Structure formats: structure tokens, C-alpha cells
């Protein structure tokens, strides 16, 4: 990466009549392997390098990017971003919350460097997983295992004196399996992800995880019974807690969405200026605290500084059942009279940084998983989900269980076929009356923006109980 060229672009931007300028360079080595039913279906290996310029001038914001690494191109980018900013000026001028410049370097270390693992070994290890799945008595005719890897070097500078260098290896795995029993199919999808080296792949124990999923799907087909519709206690596994935290807390708390910036693409939020919900409004039981924390070590959503040069920290979104803090970039922070909390990310050099979640999860309580289930006289345990949807205000939502069981007198009984809960954000979080001590995470890819930016995140939390909710 030519950091001198990036610095040159910033110096040239400073020669313009600007309020603010920044440059951001990315160099990403990308590799992806796909195994489909025992065959290597795809192997991709690329290197993508480029940089972008963003300029604030006369209350307008301009952005330009390129993968051409020349001084002429740097000047062209600056001129283009500057012209865009001038043309975009409006009565309601854009401003950025004040921040001090930062000069630092940070990187994620690898115990087993991904660069040192030959492609042949990676393919062989994925093939071993597929072989283990195909050699079972359970019929698993559909098996897709994918392993995407990104090694990303970044360099960020701005007109306030920031110069931040970083290196992050991200390794992920996606698995789709289809189990067929007596002509009836059931499917499961699992995603794994870490900011780490190849040691993460070793630690996931994907074979056992996927075999467990296959056994559960088979049992659901054989023994799963429909739910008797009605109000009941619902115990949710960590996967369900995580998706609910992400969808009904994380997204509606994004400040750009709150201000209407996402309205034409993904909708808005039930939280908005002048509406019934705002900071300080109760949204759940006082035992409910949901945070978004980029600093969880080795997490899929890990970073130390965001893509506007702001130091990462834990953000309290719902605190003690109260709407507490929005996810901000510098623009939304200025608009709402506060400071950025380091929530601005871009997935590549040709994408503008926007407000994003990192690792969104419910904080632990003081119960054990066993105690929660033993305390239920009659209910449902929805350990994982197979589908979900939520409206464009992130208020009305629906979750369908994958691995689920009836609870009778504190014991798990027969499996339940696709139990459904349809509820609202406030009802969901107000119904929580027990939270486990143990937090678990699942990797996910959060979609947002136009052009789309799929950002690596964790969802998660403990096992929870929702008291007397309608399940069908």
C-alpha cells in the first residue's frame, strides 16, 4: 500500500476551501472455497486495492474512489469529491461532531497465520467435514460448505491530523445442510466467523456442530408436533436472543435510520424525533440491557477505531429497559448534539462509511440455563430459529423455531415443529423475566446500504425466558 500517495491526496484536498477531508485506503486479499456435495465447486483468490476521498465543503459532502494508484488519479479524486460536495450543499448544512486527531497503529494477531496454510490443506479440511456428513445414516443430500477469508490492511487519514493504520484477518464459514426423512426435507444454516487466524477454524469444531444440526432436523421430521396455539412461557436459546437483539434493538437504534436516511432503502425506525419512543423511553423490563461492543476480542465485528477514526467502545443501546444511546457517526452525532461513538464502517474503499452495528448482544443475568427451564411449568424452548422477519420500523416481528421442544414441569419433552412467535419490540423485551448468566455469540453478516454493504457482526446473548407470550 502506497501511504505516501494517500497522504498526497489529503495534502491536495487541504489546498481547497474545505471544512474537512479524509482519505481511506484498503488492501484486501480475498480467498473463498466452496464445497458442494463432496466436490470443490469454487475456488476464488483475489487482491483488491484502492482508496477513497471524502470532503465536506459548504455544508455538502462529496465522495470519490479509485483503484488507480497515481498522483494524477489522486488529484482527480479530490477534485471530483470537492465538486460533489459543492453541488450537494443545501440549506440544512451537513456538519461533523468535533474530534481530535489520532495517530496510531493496531492489528489483530494470528496464532496460526492464514497466509501459511496452503490452499490444498484448506480444501482437504473442508472435504473432511463434508465426508463426515455424507457418511452418516442420516440422509443429507444437500451439503454446501463455504469458507471466505479476508486479510485487510487499512490506512486512514484526515485533515484533523489523524493517521491510523490497521490489519485485520477475518475468517468465516457458511454451511447449508438439507436432511430428508421419508420424503420430507428440513434445512439448517450455520455461520461461523472470527477476527483471527486459522486457529479459529480448528476451534469451531464444525463437524460436530453440523452433525448435531442434522440429528435435530431428522428428529423434527420424525417426532415434531405442532404447537397448541395460545399464551405460554417461551424460553429462547442464545441464537434467538441474538437475532432479536440485532433486529429489534440494533437496527432501530441506528441514528441515520432514526433521522430518515435509510427510509428509501430499508425503512425507518419506530424511534424518531417527536415520536412516542426516544432516549429515556421504557422499551423493556428493567433487567434488559443490550449493548453493541466492537471491542470483544477476536469477534467477527471487532475493530479498535472505526472508519472515521473514532476509538471504539461499548455502546449501551437499551439500558435497564430504557432506550439509552443511539449508534452514531460524526454526521448524525452533530445533528443530534452529541459525539460519535465510533459506529461508522465501510466494507471496502469504494463504499462510504455508514452507521453500523458491530457485536450486538444482551448482557447476562443471574440464572443458569437449567434453572430457567426447571422454573417453567408449561412452555416452549425455542433453541434456534429457521426464519424471521420484521417490519420496516423494526417494531412488528416474527420468529420461527428450528430446534424447539415442549417444556413440561421443568423438563424438555418432545420436539416442536416450527413454533412461531409474532410480537412487537416492546412486548418482547417487556416480557423477559429471566436471563441466564452465560452469553454465547453467533457470527452473522449484516446487510445495509445502497450499494449493499455486508458487514461482519456478532449477534448473541444468554438464554432468556419470555413470560406468557402468544405462540402458535
Label each region the model flagged.
Residues 1-472:
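N-terminal small-residue-enriched
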